[in-house]
Design a protein with these regions (language model features):
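Phosphate- and other anionic-substrate recognition elements at nucleic-acid/protein interfaces
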Residues: 2-3, 11-141
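Conserved catalytic-loop position in the HRD/HxD motif
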Residues: 7
Length: 141
């Protein structure tokens, strides 16, 4: 079974998927939704038809001092929709602090053109979210 990492944003959602053993994460895609969560849920339904996903991992936007951002409530609203649409698939959250910073550093290191960065930053962030979750799970064993 695989895990699906989700970087939820106002207009784009980055998606990453684990391998079946839960060892590696790879970027899947960025879904452009412009506030229409139905588009995201429909795409997730298609992904679930293609892959055996056993857990959704969503990045929670926490401030550096540990306080909650205003985006936390928006993300929690999406999580509620996700749980209603896919009640059999558990949703886990993970602190996503610095994932976007790490994604930008990765893209700079790889010399990715600035026009392309906007298209893939959310997917790369989703990879970091998923990797963070999987590493945490590994360390708890």
């Amino acid at each position: 079974m695989r895990k699906l990492g989700i970087d939820y944003g106002d207009s784009r959602v980055g998606l990453a998927i684990s391998d079946e053993l839960g060892i590696t994460a790879q970027g899947l895609e960025t879904v452009h939704h412009n506030g229409n969560d139905k588009l995201v849920l429909k795409r997730l339904e298609e992904i679930l038809a293609q892959y055996e996903i056993d857990t959704f991992i969503i990045g929670m936007p926490i401030n550096m001092d540990g306080s909650r951002t205003e985006r936390v409530q928006v993300t929690q609203n999406f999580i509620h929709k996700l749980r209603c649409k896919f009640p059999k698939i558990p949703v886990e959250t993970i602190d996503e602090r610095l994932t976007t910073v790490a994604a930008h550093k990765t893209m700079n290191y790889l010399n990715i053109h600035k026009d392309k960065k906007k298209e893939i930053v959310d997917t790369i962030s989703a990879v970091y979210i998923l990797e963070t979750y999987m590493n945490k799970q590994k360390n708890q064993k």
